[in-house]
Structures are given as C-alpha cells and as structure tokens.
Amino acid sequence: MASGYRKLGRPTDQRRAMLRNLVTSFLKHGKIETTVTRAKETRSLAEKMITLAKRGDLHARRQVLSFVTEETVVKKLFDEVAPKYSERNGGYTRIYKMGPRRGDGAEIVILELV
C-alpha cells in the first residue's frame, strides 16, 4: 500500500518548488483556487506551518522561513494567523469543491483558512 505524499506528475525539485509557492500564496491571501490533489498536499504542508508558528520560538520561525518563500508571509503567519488558532488543534483549513475546470475538466477547489 503506497502512502506518504502525492507526486503530482513532476520531478522532486519542481514539485517542491510548486508546493512552496502554493503554501506561500495560501498563507499570504488566506485562500487559493487549485485542483483537488494540489489542494490536499498544500493543506497538509500549510497546517504544519501553522502548527510550527503556534510554537512561536526562534527555531520554529527559522524552520518556517526555510520553506515559505516570503519573509512578509512568515511575519503575518506568526503575528496574525497563529494566534487566531491558539485554541484549535489542527483542522485550520477547509476545502470547497467548485466543479470542473473549463479547459481540461480537472476538479477545481477553493482551499481556505477556517
């Protein structure tokens, strides 16, 4: 039984770069529109970043900085997003299905912070 993560049809370096960009955009804007599988992978990583930010120490900040590509987003994550979820253990995100994409019929969803 395969488990772990989705390959998303890309080599490792491209997949990692794409997911870093998706997580950064998601944390910056609070919601993004993407495909189901990308959203599920992004959700997993974003929730890990929020949990790290809730710790609030320097090591956690550096760990988040090594993944999130913009310092302003890290500042927002630690100062605004993490305190909002201080009482909640996980489940910081929600996925809404929007139907198929017009061009290729891929299932589109909106991933947003709860």
UniProtKB/Swiss-Prot annotation:
A family per Pfam: Ribosomal_L17
Keyword Ribosomal protein (UniProt): yes
Gene Ontology CC, one term: cytosolic large ribosomal subunit
Keywords: Ribonucleoprotein, Ribosomal protein
One function term, GO molecular function aspect: structural constituent of ribosome
Domain of life, per lineage: Bacteria
GO biological process: translation
Gene3D superfamilies linked: Ribosomal protein L17
Quaternary context: Part of the 50S ribosomal subunit. Contacts protein L32.
Family: Belongs to the bacterial ribosomal protein bL17 family.
Protein name listed in UniProt: Large ribosomal subunit protein bL17
Originating species: Clostridium acetobutylicum (strain ATCC 824 / DSM 792 / JCM 1419 / IAM 19013 / LMG 5710 / NBRC 13948 / NRRL B-527 / VKM B-1787 / 2291 / W)
Protein's gene: rplQ
